[in-house]
Amino acid sequence: MSTGPFLGEILRYFVVLLMLAAATAKLRDLAGFRDNLASLFGMGPALRAVAAPAVAVAELAVAVLLLGGLTHAGLLAALLMLGVFTALVGYKFYTQSVVRCGCFGEAERSLSGLDLLRNVLVMAAIGAGLAQPAGLTPPLHVAVLAASLGCLACVVAVHFHEIVHLLSPSDG
């Protein structure tokens, strides 16, 4: 297996795990996510009751597409979802300054420019994945390695804000 398809496999698992992490966080605190939709977008109770689980289900559907062998469709769906979400939340961030997202269950922390940067980096990675040619199904040991590296990338993405702060010089 050449490098391109292997990197594509890593990316596929990365996006699968990222979508599963986002959906799981929302489903674990669906009431909190519904409340967050009200504060972020001013949604009424009826719309929030539908939108909150629909977002989580859409994230799960992207993971299923990617795991089911529809990599191109899954990556396109992930790119579209993340692009729309980042644009909406980015607009709110720049117009209101204090925005709570809670995409990965961190509702107590305000959104920062680092979160938007993370999303842009994830979208760039997805774009790179879309540019990869469709490969053959890798052997099991290659798939396990790709999934492991995708998992590592997912942990870095989910905790990007905290990792950057840990690696930044402190003020004293």
Give a label for each model feature.
Residues 1-171:
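Membrane-interfacial helix-loop segments of redox and metal-homeostasis proteins
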